[in-house]
Amino acid sequence: VFQDSISAVNPRKTVREILREPMRHLLSLKKSEQLARASEMLKAVDLDDSVLDKRPPQLSGGQLQRVCLARALAVEPKLLILDEAVSNLDLVLQAGVIRLLKKLQQQFGTACLFITHDLRLVERFCQRVMVMDNGQIVETQVVGEKLTFSSDAGRVLQNAVLPAFPVRRRTTEKV
């Protein structure tokens, strides 16, 4: 599942066609079974059949990202790769998609490789974190209450996290 859901789908196809495409190529299902599976996957990502005949430009960013999740899950993968999959969403939608991913992990037993630069998302979703620098893994740790890194690359990520609330600075003004 990619960061840019708009580029990940053909804008001229309907959601029904988008969901059926991987099933046609990767599963031995009849058309009626594919359609039933498409409907089931939409329900799993909190969408209903009313979106089946819509095209991507008619959907919100959050809806389209959930369609992409449904498409990926339709073929029952053992591993789901999420490449910055919530980066283009606002914080409310990010939180909703993270909750949805946790639910889907439990429901389908699918492992997730969650690629992100946002450590707040790592803390909310992941059990283990690996830090990469120039294509090499430089640090691995279990995600606990507070992530602290020893590698330079890990500390750069850690220092890039914005505080939950703005920090007020005291200023002294001479009049």
Show which residues each predicted segment covers.
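C-terminal boundary and immediately downstream tail of ABC-type ATPase nucleotide-binding domains
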Residues: 147-175
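Conserved ABC ATPase "signature" region
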Residues: 33-50, 158-159
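A short, surface-exposed alpha-helical micro-motif characterized by mixed small hydrophobic
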Residues: 122-124
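Conserved ABC ATPase signature
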Residues: 55-59, 63
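Conserved catalytic motifs of ABC-family nucleotide-binding domains
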Residues: 76
